[in-house]
Amino acid sequence: MLYRKAQVSDRWLRAPLQAPTALHQPLSYISRSHIADVFASQENGRKDISVCFTGHRAIPPQELPALTERRDRVLEALYQHGFRDFICGGALGFDTLAAQRILLMRTHHADVRLRLAIPCSTQSARWKASDCLIYEQLLYAADETVVLSSHYYEGCMYMRNRYMVDNSAFCVCYLNRQKGGTMYTALYAMQEGLPLLNLAIASDCERLIQGTKV
């Protein structure tokens, strides 16, 4: 498992409950001021085979069965199109749903890689214990984890979203509300020229699965 290493303060180390245990083994903090320099040369080589995911935290129960089926079929189609790296933000809801399926894909496609882009090490500080447990499991299982800040600050989620888009060649979203972080990320992806597939639109998913452009 690859982690990005840097030093953090003793104060942060003395507060293990503020960040998941996985982020302390080893430390995986990098300041946002160094993101471009550190990652440009290392990630560009895989950008062409990378897909990022963005979606709402709250998923209506009645939409979950159809969304799950589309997720599974779209991920397999993306693999057949040559994509191998899948970048998720590690948040609740759609992010977790995507990451869990990617890990399952890895059991029968050995070259699949799950890359987590975490906005801050304290992302899960106020989550329920059950959600934190799932988050820890994802952190340990991921092939690569990038933590963009040691602490929360206003705008860190948007920084994470831009990082994912900047290191991808395709964006998959679950978007049914015209506001919030998912909408921002989808607009940014389109601005940067990435193909965008919305899992909330069944016809677009079917076109990709059938091998035609979205």
Region roles according to the model:
Residues 9, 13-24:
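N-terminal polybasic/positive-inside topogenic patches
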Residues 1, 211-214:
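Short intrinsically disordered terminal tails
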Residues 29-211:
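Acidic/glycine-enriched connector segments
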Residues 3-6:
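Extreme N-terminal basic, low-complexity initiation segments
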